Amino acid sequence: MKLDILAIGAHPDDVELGCSATLTKEIANGKKIGIIDLTRGELGTRGTAETRDEESTEAANILGVSVRVNMEFADGFFVNDKVHQVELIKMIRKFKPEIVLCNAIDDRHIDHGKGSKLVSDACFLSGLIKIDTKCPDEDGWQEPWRPKHVYHYIQWKHIEPDFIVDVSGFMDKKMEAVLAYKTQFFDPNSDEPETPISSKNFTDSIEYRARDLGRLIGVKHGEGFTVERYVAVDSLYNLK
C-alpha cells in the first residue's frame, strides 16, 4: 500500500498529540495516511499494553487512517541501531511515503528524541540500494525508497516551529482521537496514579497550544513542525 504521509511515534498517542489535526486535514484532502507506533507503551504508569492497543485502534478509526502498525520495540529501551533501523526500513519501503512525520528531536521523554533520530536515520538508509530487505507479507526483495521530507512535530517542550499548518476546523477530531486514550489523559473518576499528562491542565493545553500557534499565523488553530533541512519553494507566491 502506497501512502502519501506516514506518521511515526515512539508511543501510542504521540501521533495523536503531535500532528493528528494535520493528518485529518490531509485525509479530507484525499491523501492516504498511515501511522506506525514504535512501542506499545508498556512502561506507561497508567493502563496496560493491551488497553493501549485497544485505544490506538479506536483512535485510528476516529482519524480515518488507512493503516496502523505497531513495531513492538521495547518501550524505554529501544535503541537506534542496525536491528531497529532495518525493521523500520522494511516499513518505509513497504508504504513508500512521500512525507514522514515523527517525534520531536528533543523532548521530556527519552524515547521521543531516540525515536526521532531512529526514524530520521532509517529514512535516509532506506534509500540506499545496497541495503537488502524483505518484508514477511511481500514477495521478493524490496526496492529502495527515501521519503522526500521528514518533519518533526512538537510535543512536551516548547519548541519554536519552522512552519505551522493551519488546522482550523480539525481540532475536534484531534481531541476525539486523543481522548480515545482513556487510560492516559484526564479522568476525574480514575484511581490510577497521576502522571504529567493525566491532569486537566495538560488536556486543556492541547487546545490552547493549538490556538496560540494559530494566532501566530492569523488563523484559529495551528500545529507546528520543525525541519532537518531547508524547505524549498518554487515561488514566493506559494508561501501563505
Annotate the PLM regions.
Residues K2-L6, K82-K240:
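Metal-dependent de-N-acetylase/amidase catalytic core
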